[in-house]
Amino acid sequence: MGSTFIAYTLENIKASPAWTMPPYEQIICSCEAGTRSIAVGKLSRCDHIPSSNFIIQRGPVGTLIVVDSGTDICSYLLRADESGSEYHTTSLSSLPESLCVIPFTTCTVMGTDAYVYNNSGGVLTIMWMGSSIYMTITIYGRHDTFAKTVDNLHLVQNCSRQFYPTVVAEPRKDDPQQNSEAAQVLSKSVPGFIEYVGANPTDTLHEHTPPILDKFPHISGEDILIEALREADLRMEDSQCSPVNYPSPMPYGFTEDSCLLESVKIYP
């Protein structure tokens, strides 16, 4: 049973006051810089984030996090158990040293050229310290069976335009494909994912081609992880943030392999 850890560190935060209209909550923020780290087993990746805007929305069915760098956008939808009455035990807050812990049952990640769904649960934490915010998403392993995602995949085709949160600060334009890489890395790294990608990356989601589910056979999560890393030729780093972001194309097929580390090229 493997787990995946995603961590955002955002510095020099400018946040709007928390907006609350029960049962909905929202915080809109901007940051001058930050990092995003993804760890799967013994492998890890860390990228620098440019000046960006982000939005945190919370409702009765889940929590939505959107990170917008101006040239690209990535969103995380963490759905809650609808039968869990303890979901709203804590409220979103931007006060210093505030902490919010939110459990979830499924995770959906969407970028401009990727749609990834995982039917494993986990925990989201949001902590404010001084002028920085720390957000972590921990996904616990995978279920034995895949969730049905056909209806969800059709939602991607019906999206007519991208959504950008209210602008708080002017983002830099010099780092394209920054945030969509999060979805791409997750699709190759998290066991149990079903993914959908268009044949050609585009600026709008509605131009994706229809999903072809038979390209993704039902195999073990370890096999998916091994082959995805090999197909994508990921640049994996050991505990250091890479100064630039490398493109990470989505894999289009999976086969078996016996050695995980041999499938990953290590770059200095």
Swiss-Prot record:
GO annotations of cellular component type: host cell nucleus
Subcellular location: Host nucleus
Keyword Magnesium: no
Key words, A-Z: Host nucleus
The keyword Hydrolase appears for this protein: no
Domain of life the protein comes from: Viruses
Xref: Pfam families: Herpes_UL4
Similarity comment text for this entry: Belongs to the alphaherpesvirinae HHV-1 UL4 family.
The name this protein goes by in its record: Nuclear protein UL4 homolog
